[in-house]
Amino acid sequence: MQPATLQWSSYVLQLRVTTTAILKPGELRLFKCGLGITPPSSAVVCICRDESSFTSSPFTYIDPKDYGNIPFAVQNISDLDLDLSRLPIVLNIFALPHANVNISNLPVQRIEAHDRHIIPHGQCDAKFVIYGPLTRIKIQVADIRWIEQTPEEPTRYSFKAEIWVNLQNTPLDQIFKTGNIEFISHKNVYISRILLCGNLLILKANYENDYLLDDNFYPEQLAIQISLTPQTADITLSQNQETLLKCNTHSITVCATKNIIPNTVTPVHCSFNTIFNSNSNFTGLFIPKLLLGISTTTGIWDETRPLYITMKAFKKNRRINYSQPIGVVYFFPKQILPPGNNVEFNWTEASKIYVNTESPNGPVRNTVTFTNQAVLRTPSLSTVANLTPDINMGIFLSSLRVAFDTAHMVPLHFSLKPGESTRMEFMPPGTPQNLTILEGDVGIHFIPCHNHSHRSSP
């Protein structure tokens, strides 16, 4: 009797799916097939086209809100019609366990000297409350002198100011190394840096506003509450770019630095003047968000280098708004993800499955291919006989030239509501499979692309 839901686990799931549809040259489609996953702990679920696929698909992460029924994007990049009943869509799904890092974007940076000739504001009152390993400072500042900046996005106001806090008799050993903003009285103001020079605490304040949406101007006075703790961060950012690099629990959401209407010829760049320090322990991996019609660089973010991202449209009338999420940075130990400069557009990235074998000259990666396997119409779920759980295999990202062995991956729990004709050719064991293959006409349902708009919120 066919179970109501097929459930199994594996390190890599390869989709080799067919459907009775023709994909026209340049045509872009989204589809679902009822495939779901159980949310993994501390891992990012990735999807990338297999190098054997005739269709193009982006290397991207799967948004947790889509875990119940994963959407897939495909495009015909050839000049000919693609008959999807004969030429399957081939995708690889896998999960990478990222490091559970603590991220600080407001370290207290000690400096030796600062120009104190012109006080940048009027009266500044500060109250200090010390709770052992925490110092809380409540600040009231008036007559702030804002200095206009030239923002990358021309529709925005951008001003900066300094706020000087006299530490009075507060012991310097209570001015801890990690800052946290608990309250700011104006929604468009954020603190980008905290500096300590002798007995002077300097807050670098930024005011940003879109004058097309809100014509309010910068505030002349502010109330600010900050706390300082001795917490040691695994990842320390050189500054807080709150509207562009949004720190999550263990990752950073990267947002567009300007309103972008990319054309299909000229790439558009987003540069971030922030570097990170991890004491040489971690490397960042930027994985683009699925933005229909837009291809984004996938890149390794090396320590002490600014993040630089390029986007290019391959469909007309695309738009990205200022501060709209365009991807996420996850951090991995350097032993797993070596530093590198390799970046490629995510719609051109391809992956392949490999098996590690020993040779006199050391380990060799042999690509797993299915070139002689006929395209099936009957939906089935199967394994590969010689890829038992004790075989050392992995996934290779061809453009990035990064390999992830199963030792550096985490298995996923998959589920699928099968049709009456779906065959499951193995019994789910207690241990996860290395590779499972879901193939045939599994009931693809195409989704209108406007449901996953490039204007979508984070």
Swiss-Prot record:
Q: Which terms are listed as keywords in the entry?
A: Glycoprotein
Q: Which domain of life is it from?
A: Viruses
Q: Name one Pfam family in it.
A: Herpes_UL82_83
Per the record's keyword annotation, is Glycoprotein included, yes or no?
Answer: yes
Glycosylated where? 76, 102, 281, 321, 346, 434, 451
InterPro entries, A to Z: Herpes_UL82/UL83
Membership in a protein family: Belongs to the herpesviridae UL82 family.
The molecule here is called: Protein U54
Q: Which organism is it from?
A: Human herpesvirus 6A (strain Uganda-1102)
Q: What are the top taxonomic ranks of the organism?
A: Viruses, Duplodnaviria, Heunggongvirae, Peploviricota, Herviviricetes
